[in-house]
Swiss-Prot record:
It is found in: Cytoplasm. Mg(2+) binds at residues 16, 51, 112. Belongs to the dethiobiotin synthetase family. Homodimer. Its EC number is 6.3.3.3. ATP binds at residues 12-17, 51, 112-115, 202-204. Substrate binds at residue 41. It comes from Bacillus licheniformis (strain ATCC 14580 / DSM 13 / JCM 2505 / CCUG 7422 / NBRC 12200 / NCIMB 9375 / NCTC 10341 / NRRL NRS-1264 / Gibson 46). This is ATP-dependent dethiobiotin synthetase BioD.
Length: 235
């Protein structure tokens, strides 16, 4: 099947905005797209402001909250830590089994992780292991400012070492008046990471669905993502 996994260099880099905008744009291009965010911490999926609600809204999937996000934890912590505090255990096979139940409901899926690529989801597995288990390529979302070259390079190299195909990188949240760091980091990241720079997206003051949609449409090369997905599906 077609699809990709949106991961990040850290928490709070804008994975949900990027995933939502890509879902909306693919939908606009008549792609039957679904969304899957298996782990959610510190929010209720039914909350209209939750990541799950935004993903469902912008993809227009008929999947239920529970199908999109089967594992929800009260505390805003790494899923493994949050689950331990509740006396719960979620194994990799549990996440994969939920995926198998929905993966044929849409032609294409956008899956969003939790935090960065090495965040622990369970006792013996990380986000990277989930990406591998779902057999999807990855889109990495990175921040634009000082220090991001190091974090993005480490994320991309780790993904490659894990055998994860990286479609490209989106640098999200660049300011309206970027300093030298934000001006120079995109070129350095593309050069050193050795994967395509899919786009550099602005910091949104109004993160409404419409603004998110236009941000992706104006600043991200979605055709490159589609081509990379097609190449992967044909292998």
């Amino acid at each position: 099947m077609k699809g990709f996994f949106v991961t990040g260099t850290d928490t709070g880099v804008g994975k949900t905005f990027i995933a939502c905008g890509l879902a909306a744009l693919l939908k606009e291009q008549h792609v039957d797209v679904g969304v899957f965010k298996p782990f959610l911490s510190g929010e209720l999926a039914s909350d209209p402001q939750s990541d799950t609600a935004l993903l469902k809204n912008m993809s227009e999937t008929p999947l239920t909250d529970e199908e999109v996000t089967p594992f929800i934890f009260k505390e805003p912590l790494a899923p493994y830590t949050a689950a331990k505090l509740e006396g719960r255990t979620v194994g990799l096979e549990d996440a994969v089994n939920h995926w198998k139940k929905i993966k044929d409901r849409h032609e294409c899926f956008i899956v969003e992780g939790a935090g960065g690529i090495a965040v622990p989801l369970g006792e013996d597995y990380f986000v990277s292991d989930l990406i591998k288990a779902l057999d999807l390529p990855a889109v990495i979302v990175a921040r634009p400012n000082l220090g991001t070259i190091n974090h993005t390079y480490l994320t991309a190299q780790y993904a490659k070492q894990m055998g994860i195909r990286v479609i490209g990188i989106v640098i999200n949240g660049i300011s309206s008046r970027p300093g030298l760091d934000e001006q120079t980091n995109p070129d350095m990241i593309e050069r050193f990471c050795g994967v395509p720079l899919l786009g550099v997206t602005p910091k949104l003051e109004d993160a409404s669905p419409t603004q998110i949609h236009h941000m992706i449409k104006d600043h991200v090369d979605v055709s490159l993502i589609m081509n990379q997905m097609q190449m992967g599906a044909e292998k």
